[in-house]
């Protein structure tokens, strides 16, 4: 945090993560329109616009919008097929939606005066719990009691199998925790560092260095936004594979 006593200005790197109502100053309830819901809606709108306008023409020689849409589609489709196999492709629409939402929410959060929904554990936890609940239900529907074979390491010595089963069970229920914290933590940390460098830009003596640092951090954050969307999605595919093929 940097303070400018004369002007009474206070810069705090965590102020950008405060959820505020869009209208008025009242308390935030579950039904209150907030800056978080606004930017999530904008992310959904941007995804819809890209996929609608990018696939509408279906030109043999694609334009830039169509190229981006086809690149995203092809990358996620290959990811799902490589990790889960052919039988996992029926769940591709959900995985594609998840990847695009996280990616666009991350990128929109880099705009000045914007808000990054994926920096909040409340948002990422909902995404992670939906994945966890979905693959768990799918595992039992597809495999019945055989889904429990995911926790029984048959290749291990018999004496160690009960211990490993407990460890596997604990690690399974920790999945949504690590899945959500990883995304929120990385996005929040990067945005906070950019805010810190921006605060130092107000000090004339170090302003040039601060501007260079902000530029470098923005470049790094673009990469982090892409990587975190990819990591969240590929872990979803791994969990989906466990539900479809639970045997160790």
Curated annotation (Swiss-Prot):
Membrane found in the keyword field: yes
Main location group: membrane
This protein's record includes keyword Nucleus: no
Entry GO terms, CC: plasma membrane; proton-transporting ATP synthase complex
Membrane-crossing segments per the record: 34-54, 91-111, 121-141, 147-167, 196-216, 220-240
Gene3D superfamilies the record matches: ATP synthase, F0 complex, subunit A (1.20.120.220)
SUPFAM superfamilies membership: F1F0 ATP synthase subunit A
Keywords on record: ATP synthesis, Cell inner membrane, Cell membrane, CF(0), Hydrogen ion transport, Ion transport, Membrane, Transmembrane, Transmembrane helix, Transport
Coiled coil: none
Subunit structure: F-type ATPases have 2 components, CF(1) - the catalytic core - and CF(0) - the membrane proton channel. CF(1) has five subunits: alpha(3), beta(3), gamma(1), delta(1), epsilon(1). CF(0) has three main subunits: a(1), b(2) and c(9-12). The alpha and beta chains form an alternating ring which encloses part of the gamma chain. CF(1) is attached to CF(0) by a central stalk formed by the gamma and epsilon chains, while a peripheral stalk is formed by the delta and b chains.
Family: Belongs to the ATPase A chain family.
Function: Key component of the proton channel; it plays a direct role in the translocation of protons across the membrane.
UniProt name for this protein: ATP synthase subunit a
Organism phylogeny: Bacteria, Pseudomonadati, Pseudomonadota, Alphaproteobacteria, Rhodobacterales
Gene from which the chain derives: atpB
């Amino acid at each position: 945090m940097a303070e400018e006593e004369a002007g009474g200005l206070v810069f705090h790197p965590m102020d950008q993560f405060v959820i505020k109502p869009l209208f008025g100053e009242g308390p935030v309830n579950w039904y209150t329109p907030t800056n978080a819901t606004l930017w999530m809606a904008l992310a959904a709108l941007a995804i819809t616009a890209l996929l609608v306008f990018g696939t509408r023409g279906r030109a043999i020689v694609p334009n830039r919008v169509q190229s981006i849409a086809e690149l995203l589609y092809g990358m996620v489709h290959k990811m799902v097929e490589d990790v889960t196999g052919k039988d996992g492709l029926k769940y591709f629409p959900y995985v594609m939606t998840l990847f695009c939402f996280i990616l666009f929410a991350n990128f929109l959060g880099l705009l000045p005066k914007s808000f990054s929904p994926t920096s909040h554990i409340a948002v990422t936890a909902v995404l992670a719990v939906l994945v966890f609940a979905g693959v768990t239900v799918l595992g039992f529907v597809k495999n019945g009691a055989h889904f429990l074979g995911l926790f029984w390491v048959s290749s291990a010595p018999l004496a160690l199998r009960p211990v490993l089963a407990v460890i596997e069970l604990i690690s399974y229920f920790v999945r949504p925790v690590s899945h959500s914290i990883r995304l929120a933590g990385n996005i929040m940390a990067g945005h906070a560092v950019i805010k810190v460098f921006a605060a130092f830009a107000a000090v004339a003596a170090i302003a040039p260095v601060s501007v260079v640092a902000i530029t470098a951090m923005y470049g790094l954050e673009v990469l982090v936004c892409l990587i975190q969307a990819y990591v969240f999605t590929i872990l979803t595919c791994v969990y989906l594979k466990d539900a479809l093929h639970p045997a160790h």
